[in-house]
């Protein structure tokens, strides 16, 4: 293990802040489709969480976020350069662990990492020629769904579960990832400060694309057009932000966004068809439901 004092402090910052750990939990859950006692399963779960943590350090720099998991972000404490390098070290550590899990696991992790980065790139550069909603969903599949899909697949692969389970688990994870992010969009508007670890409307003010705003752009009534003009003006003042959040909370696009998240969770559950009936399948279905029932 690397004993560099600063890196130890910075890389443990978000670990100690908590979090849901939903990705490694999914790896452990899917391992019960095979021999869940294999040590490689624990290593796979570690790879998933290290990769996820690395992306958080980079995401927070790109989003200029002040809070993560209710604590100050790494870059707000140590600066952008240190935060970026901390993310790099976490990716390096994930690569070290996955290198011991065989060629296939290594390739799957590398392919997922590429998708993850491209998803982030496409979100950053923005949409040019594609339908805005289609583009957004594809970004979510790549940026979030890909790693959740890998989490499920590695659990099955490294527990020597049936080969035929890997494809449906990949589809499940990707759909759950989309549902998760769509609920995040809703939570950004609906949450109280202490529920989600960030202030309501954080993404809204940062002009980060979210489903409610994408759906709002399709509306033509006067109230929707006026609200969109307010949002597009930048929400510089707290009063404007609070006004936009209040209007969005009561707007039909919120219910439409929740319905979309629920539909992706249902799609995730439908993808589990090839899996055997039993406790693992039931737990995966409950996992998909929990993603859209959360409020923080």
PLM regions and their residue ranges:
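Mg2+-dependent prenyl diphosphate-binding active-site environment of isoprenoid biosynthetic enzymes
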Residues: 2-226, 289
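A generic alpha-helix signature
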Residues: 21, 89, 146, 256-259, ...
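Short, amphipathic C-terminal "tail helix"
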Residues: 264, 270, 277-296
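A short structural micro-motif
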Residues: 115, 175, 233-237, 250-251, ...
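Juxtamembrane/interfacial segments around transmembrane helices
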Residues: 137-139, 260, 295-296
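Mobile late-domain/C-terminal helix-loop "cap" segments
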Residues: 224-275
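Short, charged, amphipathic alpha-helical segments
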Residues: 167-170, 259, 282-286
């Amino acid at each position: 293990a690397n004993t560099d004092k600063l890196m130890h402090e910075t890389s443990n910052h978000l670990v100690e802040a908590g979090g849901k750990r939903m990705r490694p939990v999914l790896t452990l859950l899917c391992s019960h489709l095979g021999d869940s006692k294999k040590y490689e399963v624990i290593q796979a779960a570690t790879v998933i969480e290290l990769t996820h943590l690395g992306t958080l350090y980079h995401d927070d720099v790109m989003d200029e976020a002040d809070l993560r998991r209710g604590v100050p972000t790494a870059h707000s404490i140590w600066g952008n350069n240190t935060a970026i390098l901390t993310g790099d070290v976490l990716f390096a550590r994930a690569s070290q662990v996955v290198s011991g899990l065989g060629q296939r696991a290594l390739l799957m992790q590398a392919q997922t990492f590429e998708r993850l980065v491209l998803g982030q790139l496409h979100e950053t550069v923005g949409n040019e020629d594609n339908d805005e909603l289609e583009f957004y969903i594809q970004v979510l599949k790549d940026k979030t769904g890909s790693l959740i899909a890998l989490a499920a697949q590695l659990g099955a692969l490294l527990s020597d579960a049936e080969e035929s389970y890997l494809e449906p688990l990949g589809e499940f994870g990707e759909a759950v990832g989309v549902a998760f992010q769509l609920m995040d969009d809703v939570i950004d508007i609906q949450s109280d400060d202490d529920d989600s670890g960030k202030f309501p409307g954080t993404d809204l003010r940062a002009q980060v694309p979210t489903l409610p705003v994408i759906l709002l752009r399709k509306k033509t009534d006067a109230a929707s057009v006026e609200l969109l003009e307010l949002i597009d003006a930048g929400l510089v003042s707290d009063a404007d932000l609070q006004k936009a959040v209040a209007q969005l909370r009561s707007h039909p696009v919120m219910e439409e966004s929740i319905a979309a998240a629920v539909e992706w969770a249902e799609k995730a559950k439908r993808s589990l068809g090839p899996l055997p009936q039993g406790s693992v399948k039931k737990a995966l279905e409950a996992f998909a439901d929990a993603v859209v029932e959360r409020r923080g």
